[in-house]
A protein has these predicted regions:
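Metallocofactor- and cofactor-centric catalytic cores in central/energy metabolism, strongly enriched
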Residues: 1-158
C-alpha cells in the first residue's frame, strides 16, 4: 500500500538522498492540567507566515529556513505574507484561518471556550531538513510562551 508518507519520503530522498528523518519516539506528552476556559492559547504555525514589515523566510536554503517570526496577537490579515513554497496556497488565500485560525480562536474566547489569546503567536517554515537549529529556535519560542503564561500552543502544520 502506498501512503502519503511513503510518497513524501520518496520525494525528499530524490531531492536530498543524504536526508535522515528525525524520529521523536520519546517526546513527552504534557497533559492539560486545567480546562480550556481557564487557559491562554497561542497559535504556532509552520506555514511560513510573516509580517510585511519583517524579513521573509528563505525557502531557497538547502536545509530549510529554521528561523521564526513573531505574529502579534492583534494581527491584521492584510499585513501577513506567505513565503512557504512547499504547499498549495489556494485555500489559504481564500481564508487565512485555514492555516492561522485567529478569528476562530477569538470566537472561542468570546464564547468562553478559551480564557484568552496570547499577545504573540509564532510562525516557522515547514520543509526543514536540518532540525538541529530548528530545535534551538523552538526552545526559544517555548521559553517565550512560558514567559507569556501561555498554557496551550495550538499547532497548525502546513
Amino acid at each position: 500500500m502506498i501512503t502519503s508518507l511513503k510518497i513524501t519520503t520518496a520525494l525528499i530522498k530524490r531531492r536530498r538522498p543524504d536526508f535522515e528523518f528525525t524520529l521523536f519516539r520519546d517526546t513527552p506528552v504534557t497533559p492539560l492540567c486545567r480546562p480550556l476556559n481557564k487557559c491562554k492559547l497561542a497559535i504556532v504555525t509552520t506555514g511560513g507566515l510573516y509580517l510585511k514589515t519583517d524579513r521573509p523566510f528563505d525557502p531557497s536554503l538547502k536545509d530549510g529556513d529554521c528561523s521564526y517570526r513573531v505574529l502579534p496577537g492583534d494581527i491584521n490579515f492584510e499585513n501577513l505574507m506567505i513565503s512557504h513554497k512547499w504547499y498549495n496556497h489556494k485555500f489559504i488565500h481564500a481564508d487565512l484561518n485555514c492555516l492561522f485560525p485567529i478569528d476562530r480562536m477569538k470566537e472561542y474566547v468570546q464564547k468562553g471556550v478559551i480564557k484568552s489569546l496570547s499577545e504573540e503567536h509564532y510562525s516557522f517554515m515547514g520543509h526543514i531538513y536540518d532540525t538541529v537549529p530548528l530545535m534551538r529556535h523552538a526552545k526559544k519560542v517555548g521559553k517565550r510562551l512560558k514567559d507569556l503564561d501561555v498554557d496551550v500552543a495550538f499547532l497548525t502544520p502546513a
